[in-house]
């Protein structure tokens, strides 16, 4: 800073251009602000015309309430808005826009024309501005009820900003993504998009479930809904509904993730963490889940005014929101069974609370879920495999038992015993399915074993292929988790306590969450303003670096109010135990053993994926088999 320069007020033009740097980054930023204004005006149809990716032209026309001629100049002024009057309004704001600076910022870096007409006006009025001329010119115009905003030559007066724009296709892709997000947020509004004269999107109003499903399919692709779980739950003033993709429908990029808070699309670290936790055990490494979720909460407990573009929000009780999201998604994914995945065309697994305590998860959400499952086992159907002829087959009846809380060692021993060779076991004959397809379990009955690796089974839909090691590994893993939940986390005292240097804020956090650390098997003591002593760590993690583990947990607690680091480490150990305890490749199984494994899969959470996220089974329908052999052509 030049010591001789004096402090001066910035010109309105320069001030708006500085503000535009925060609000207007690219054409997609402009379309977001214009569409939000249209939605706030009560529009039921919005038409968008774009040329050259939005750099040459952006035109948005709506059938909303319109703007009166007296208010038109104010619409282009900074900090002028019709949406809030005082701080109380700001704290409970439900409109998408409220700051009153978007149009002023846009008009400072582009040529803007705003035309509008209210329902009780005899004619429309138009106002024009350019970046170099901030004085608006108002004149009569012809226009139906509603508003049109035309933005031409974006960044024409700021060449440096224009240089940072990408290729036309890239800019249009960003712009189209904004429209898709808003179209998902508002099913009651029709959206039509044209680019260089070509229709790209034409989405009509959606007022029923079928219409909403069509819109989601149009935006996310038909494959998403076919591989998605509908979800809806409301508890303690929080409501979550929408669709979550099955783990098998994951993506290499996080490009099919839509989360809305009170109708506003947001990208929030707390939400991302909760979703990542829920999918932790079922996603292959490096893959990303898919979801379209709508979260509704009292607007007074969420702050939407924490980011210039309003992409981020802050919850008053982030811990409660995190646990609610994680618990709901975790239960939904855990409730998926093979018969759900075979449902067509859409898997249905709507989560509803079963009582006043339903859906409540504490700091150890996953372990609380396991405890709930232990306390209230659900009855399961019994399947009886009919013989294939007198003396030619076998009678096999399987009644699934509730998963009981047994010590980890006993759980492994029981499974080793279960899969020990049966005395005098013979391969036997495959079971013939009953005519009419009645009483056939979802994964059917085993036919044979291939190379000691895969189980071939027949169900009502056709052929089922099962990776027996991966499937058994998941069953073992889930049972070990339940056993661990019942036993709890025992602590291992350290012979020599370890000293950990932390910030004062981290030390305060450790004291505040003392009970959380105790439940995790830690014993911490504060020795000074910025020093902690680690006196005990979880017994299962005695080989881990205690200092690093505690530091990571503290970082999570300060960021999210909860931590899954310990559970992740423990799950990794249990996964290793399950892998070593599972049946190996080239192990020959008798048909009763194969069928026993299939029945266990049907009654085990997340049995569709192994511990590493790979699929454990796949279905080949008769149509798929016919295509292989060109039948019917």
UniProtKB/Swiss-Prot annotation:
Q: Which cysteines are joined by disulfide bonds?
A: none
InterPro entries assigned to the protein according to its UniProt record, in alphabetical order: DNA_mismatch_repair_CS, DNA_mismatch_repair_MutL, DNA_mismatch_S5_2-like, HATPase_C_sf, MutL/Mlh/PMS, MutL/Mlh/Pms-like, MutL_C, MutL_C_dimsub
Q: Name one GO biological process term.
A: mismatch repair
The record's listing under PROSITE patterns reads:
DNA_MISMATCH_REPAIR_1
One GO location term (cellular component): mismatch repair complex
* Key words, A-Z: DNA damage, DNA repair
Q: Which GO terms describe its molecular function?
A: ATP binding; ATP hydrolysis activity; ATP-dependent DNA damage sensor activity; mismatched DNA binding
Q: Which domain of life is it from?
A: Bacteria
* Cited CDD domains: HATPase_MutL-MLH-PMS-like, MutL_Trans_MutL
Family, per entry = Belongs to the DNA mismatch repair MutL/HexB family.
Q: Which NCBIfam families match?
A: mutl (TIGR00585), PRK00095.1-2 (NF000949)
The UniProt function text for this chain reads: This protein is involved in the repair of mismatches in DNA. It is required for dam-dependent methyl-directed DNA mismatch repair. May act as a 'molecular matchmaker', a protein that promotes the formation of a stable complex between two or more DNA-binding proteins in an ATP-dependent manner without itself being part of a final effector complex.
Q: State what protein this is by name.
A: DNA mismatch repair protein MutL
Give the originating organism.
Answer: Pseudomonas fluorescens (strain SBW25)
Gene this protein is translated from? mutL
